[in-house]
Amino acid sequence: MASRGINKVILVGNLGNDPEIRYMPNGGAVANITIATSESWRDKATGEQREKTEWHRVVLFGKLAEVAGEYLRKGSQVYVEGQLQTRKWQDQSGQDRYSTEVVVQGFNGVMQMLGGRAQGGAPAMGGQQQQQGGWGQPQQPAQQQYNAPQQQQQAPQQPQQQYNEPPMDFDDDIPF
């Protein structure tokens, strides 16, 4: 089987501005956000602590865009999974311009809000949006990932939880 490659981007960072929301002619929502990721290290030559911040353009589509517009604000911590795409366009003077973005949409797109409540009163949704649990943690259906908090606070109709546990084939005769 020939491999075509993998185009997957995972980011955890903070929003640089409030999301910009617009709607396409078909009514679908589009949200543009900018996520800052930072790394720090100690400079070996000077011993100084150094930090570098990288800014990432992210575009969300559909229900994820609506959720981002309603609950994310500047400074919000967020986890996103998407694909890297480069667009080519022409500016007013006719020059070709390029813009590289992380596109979050469809089956491969994931957005999870992290951290506590934002200043604007948006509920913390990090723990409620786990798509897959680890060993001993429940696996929740993917569609719950997109539910707004109002829907989650309704009558507790939870699907029966399935647990993803490792097989229990321990050998008690191990000498250590």
From Swiss-Prot:
Gene3D superfamilies: Nucleic acid-binding proteins
Record keywords: DNA damage, DNA recombination, DNA repair, DNA replication, DNA-binding
Chain positions of motif Important for interaction with partner proteins: 171-176
Record GO cellular component, one term: nucleoid
Alphabetized InterPro entries for the sequence: NA-bd_OB-fold, Primosome_PriB/ssb, ssDNA-bd
One annotated GO biological process: DNA repair
Occurrences of domain SSB (ranges): 6-111
Pfam family, one: SSB
Span list, region Disordered: 114-176
UniProt keyword NAD, yes or no: no
Bias (Low complexity) ranges: 120-162
Molecular function (Gene Ontology), one example: single-stranded DNA binding
HAMAP family linked to this entry: SSB
General function of this protein: Plays an important role in DNA replication, recombination and repair. Binds to ssDNA and to an array of partner proteins to recruit them to their sites of action during DNA metabolism.
Subunit annotation: Homotetramer.
Name this polypeptide is given: Single-stranded DNA-binding protein
Gene: ssb
